[in-house]
């Protein structure tokens, strides 16, 4: 079974049955995976409240593999977002990042995605100074993460411009988007959605700054 959330690439839930740094036990892993399957099923049916309920069951399964619990956190954050509970999104992302750091390497993709999510929601909630500090620390740590999935790196860097954009620091935001485009153009199809998103973001801040390329 596959999941895709706002935080990163598609992940196979079945692949997380028991591996990883914190393996957990088979019974807890089975319960967590069952809850995650139900969460995805309910979400696809538009039953967001039930999807969140099942996702939280998986996240709170303390003896399950930590990777599985972090995948559950990713889903729950999406369900909280769908319900407009942005404060809960930030809170859960911060909790999940701390949970992951107890068992996994600091550069583990799931931890980076949770830290990215926390900073993202701080920006959404208007806590821009804190978001800037969180993104700055995250970007610095990313430099020590060889082999990081490019999609995760791009998502984090793209999001890091949000607090600059939200506080009217158009040139700083534009610099982030330009650097991304310089790496992506020529490497991706013109119809690539990530490329188009970054272009749109750059156009938005240039327009706001009344500066046109």
Where are these regions (language model features)?
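Conserved alpha-helical positions within TPR/SEL1-like repeat arrays
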Residues: 36-44, 70-82, 109-124, 151-166, ...
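TPR-adjacent "capping" and linker segments in tetratricopeptide-repeat scaffold/adaptor proteins
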Residues: 16-34
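Helix N-cap/loop-to-helix boundary motif
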Residues: 26-29, 63-70, 104-112, 146-154, ...
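Amphipathic alpha-helical segments of tetratricopeptide repeats
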Residues: 56-60, 97-102, 137-144, 179-186
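Alpha-helical segment of the N-proximal tetratricopeptide repeat
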Residues: 30-60, 81-86
């Amino acid at each position: 079974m596959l999941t895709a959330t706002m935080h990163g690439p598609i992940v196979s839930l079945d692949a997380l049955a028991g591996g990883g740094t914190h393996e957990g036990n088979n019974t807890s892993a089975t319960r967590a995976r069952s809850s995650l399957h139900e969460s995805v099923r309910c979400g696809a049916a538009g039953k967001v409240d039930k999807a969140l309920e099942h996702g939280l069951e998986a996240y709170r399964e303390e003896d399950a593999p930590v990777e599985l619990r972090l995948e559950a956190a990713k889903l729950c954050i999406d369900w909280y977002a769908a319900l407009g509970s942005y404060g809960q999104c930030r809170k859960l992302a911060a909790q999940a990042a701390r949970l992951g750091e107890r068992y996994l390497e600091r550069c583990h993709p799931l931890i980076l995605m949770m830290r990215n999510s926390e900073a993202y929601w701080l920006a959404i909630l208007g806590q821009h100074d804190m978001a800037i500090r969180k993104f700055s620390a995250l970007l610095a740590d990313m430099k020590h993460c060889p082999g990081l999935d490019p999609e995760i790196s791009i998502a984090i860097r793209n999001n890091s411009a949000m607090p600059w954009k939200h506080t009217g620091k158009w040139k700083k935001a534009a610099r982030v988007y330009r650097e991304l485009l310089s790496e992506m153009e020529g490497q991706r199809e013109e119809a690539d959605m990530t490329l188009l998103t970054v272009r749109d973001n750059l156009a938005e801040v240039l327009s706001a700054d009344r500066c046109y390329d």
